[in-house]
């Protein structure tokens, strides 16, 4: 599901709320989450999961075109850990 599809589905389900208001709310929420992570803070949504930053240590990689070794710097990357309720709902085949 894309952001546009999410907005469209929410606007359809909440027909009493203008679609533009739904779009603004979704965009504001995602922007706030991104800026919170950029500040190094953790986000926890009970029953859904948590977002945090994980550190990737410096390492030697390879250029996929040439095969040459490339030194990659350490960096922080976003990480999502699903909550138990989300894991249970997603486990429809188990």
UniProtKB/Swiss-Prot annotation:
Q: Which GO terms describe its biological process?
A: DNA recombination; regulation of DNA-templated transcription; regulation of translation
Residue runs in coiled coils: none
Any single GO CC term annotated in Swiss-Prot or TrEMBL for this entry: cytosol
Query: Which GO MF terms are attached to this record?
Result: DNA binding; structural constituent of chromatin
Which PROSITE patterns does the entry mention? Answer: HISTONE_LIKE
* Keyword annotations: DNA recombination, DNA-binding, Transcription, Transcription regulation, Translation regulation
| Stored InterPro entries | Hist_DNA-bd, Histone-like_DNA-bd_CS, IHF-like_DNA-bd_dom_sf, IHF_beta
Which family does the record assign? Belongs to the bacterial histone-like protein family.
List, alphabetically, the PANTHER family matched.
Answer: DNA-BINDING PROTEIN HU, INTEGRATION HOST FACTOR SUBUNIT BETA
| Subunit note | Heterodimer of an alpha and a beta chain.
Instruction: Report the protein's function.
Output: This protein is one of the two subunits of integration host factor, a specific DNA-binding protein that functions in genetic recombination as well as in transcriptional and translational control.
What protein name does the entry list?
Integration host factor subunit beta
Q: Which gene encodes it?
A: ihfB
């Amino acid at each position: 599901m894309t952001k546009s599809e999410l907005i469209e589905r929410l606007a359809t389900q909440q027909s009493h709320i203008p679609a533009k208001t739904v779009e603004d709310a979704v965009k504001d929420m995602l922007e706030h989450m991104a800026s919170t992570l950029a500040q190094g803070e953790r986000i926890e949504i009970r029953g859904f999961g948590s977002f945090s930053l994980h550190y990737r240590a410096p390492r030697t990689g390879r250029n996929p075109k040439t095969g040459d070794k490339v030194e990659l710097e350490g960096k922080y990357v976003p990480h999502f850990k699903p909550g138990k309720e989300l894991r249970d709902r997603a486990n429809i085949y188990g």
